[in-house]
């Protein structure tokens, strides 16, 4: 509570007005509990951590959608405030989705297919579990912010985007795994990982994205395989080795 007291007080000021005190019992006074999850979640957090994250997400969506400043959080939430409040949002994801066990249970299947697809692209021959045919230059998977958080937690990856907190889960964000081959070499494949997303201000202003004015990109260091350099390139063989170590085969479905 102490670590996030200032952000919680700020959120309460936005929700309840000057003084930050509700007319009745505060929804943030009840204890946090860890309960069995539903649908695609192994566990669920209930209580103030969950509620604060949900409230923050609503305010972020108001801002990103271009609502008038007087209407975002009843005129009490600007871009700077939202940057601070994102710490509450990311706290929930860090505990519920990035913690290794739920990340492994929920992310092993997706991670396995990603690795198989990279290996297939390098080999040029079909690999069981790969997505798309050999020779496909790009594969796009549409999912949820929980999928991104699961993969991040599974590999121990972290990223940062200007105007946010660590490991932001922003609308339209994407984890990107690029397969590269160095010029003049026939078999030296490596993986370059990054998180790409529009900044909140780009969303709010409906900025046209171009090569000259791109979305924000955060290169990602993958523990156990990434090397030095600004892009943290990882040899494909090392990336696969790390992936096979953290992926639990019992949660892999070859056809899903």
State the predicted function of each range.
Residues 1-139, 143-256:
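Signature for phosphate-centric chemistry
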């Amino acid at each position: 509570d102490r670590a996030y007291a200032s952000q919680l007080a700020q959120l309460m000021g936005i929700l309840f007005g000057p003084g930050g005190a509700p007319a009745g019992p505060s929804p943030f006074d009840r204890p946090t509990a860890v309960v069995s999850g539903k649908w695609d979640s192994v566990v669920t957090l209930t209580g103030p951590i969950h509620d604060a994250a949900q409230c923050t997400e609503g305010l972020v969506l108001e801002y990103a959608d271009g609502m008038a400043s007087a209407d975002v959080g009843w005129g009490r939430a600007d871009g700077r405030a939202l940057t601070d409040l994102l710490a509450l949002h990311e706290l929930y994801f860090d505990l519920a989705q990035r913690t290794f066990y739920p990340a492994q249970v929920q992310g092993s299947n997706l991670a396995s297919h990603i690795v198989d697809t990279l290996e297939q692209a390098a080999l040029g021959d079909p690999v069981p579990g790969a997505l798309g045919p050999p020779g496909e230059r790009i594969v796009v998977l549409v999912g949820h912010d929980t999928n991104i958080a699961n993969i991040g937690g599974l590999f121990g990856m972290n990223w940062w985007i200007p105007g946010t907190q660590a490991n932001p889960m922003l609308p339209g964000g994407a984890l990107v795994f690029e397969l590269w081959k160095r010029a003049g070499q026939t078999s030296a494949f490596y993986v370059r990982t990054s998180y790409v997303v529009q900044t909140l201000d780009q969303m709010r202003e409906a900025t046209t994205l171009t090569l000259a004015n791109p979305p924000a990109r955060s290169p990602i260091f993958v523990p156990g395989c990434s090397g030095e350099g600004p892009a943290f390139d990882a040899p494909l063989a090392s990336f696969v080795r790390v992936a096979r170590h953290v992926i639990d085969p019992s949660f892999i479905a070859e056809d899903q």
